[in-house]
Amino acid sequence: MGKAVVVLSSSEGVSGTVYFAQEGDGPTTVTGNVSGLKPGLHGFHVHALGDTTNGCMSTGPHYNPNGKEHGAPEDDVRHAGDLGNITVGDDGTATFTIIDSQIPLSGPNSIVGRAVVVHAEPDDLGRGGHELSKTTGNAGGRVACGIIGLQG
């Protein structure tokens, strides 16, 4: 079983830990807990670069090895890193589980060494009609991020 982890942090008081587990070539299970967010939906994506030298801004675009448009996790046309939204409760905390087949932990399209970014606003899943809908889901600013690392 492959395992990875990312510790999310920000200058805005958002923090959390996200775990990834993959059995063989099967889907990857993502489990996490993030706190310090405003209640509601927040875009949650794997970004292309594991570079936080300029905070979350240097993590690049959504991870997109297949050159597709932005979409929902269940869509055929989507970035590999499009994991949709996490739901934050009134206490500012999100606890979630996502199962996804486009974010392997090994092989040529591995997400290890890339970044996870939590956004300020909901991801419209490419359906919002905004000029950014088909690239970012119009999910707003980047409020927390971290680099995905292998876990023993």
Curated annotation (Swiss-Prot):
Pfam family, one: Sod_Cu
Cofactor note: Binds 1 copper ion per subunit.
Localization in the cell: Cytoplasm
Catalysed reactions listed for this entry: 2 superoxide + 2 H(+) = H2O2 + O2
Gene Ontology CC entries for this record: cytoplasm
Domain of life, per lineage: Eukaryota
Free-text function comment from the UniProt entry: Destroys radicals which are normally produced within the cells and which are toxic to biological systems.
Self-association state and partner proteins as the record states: Homodimer.
The protein's name in its UniProt record: Superoxide dismutase [Cu-Zn]
Native organism: Spinacia oleracea
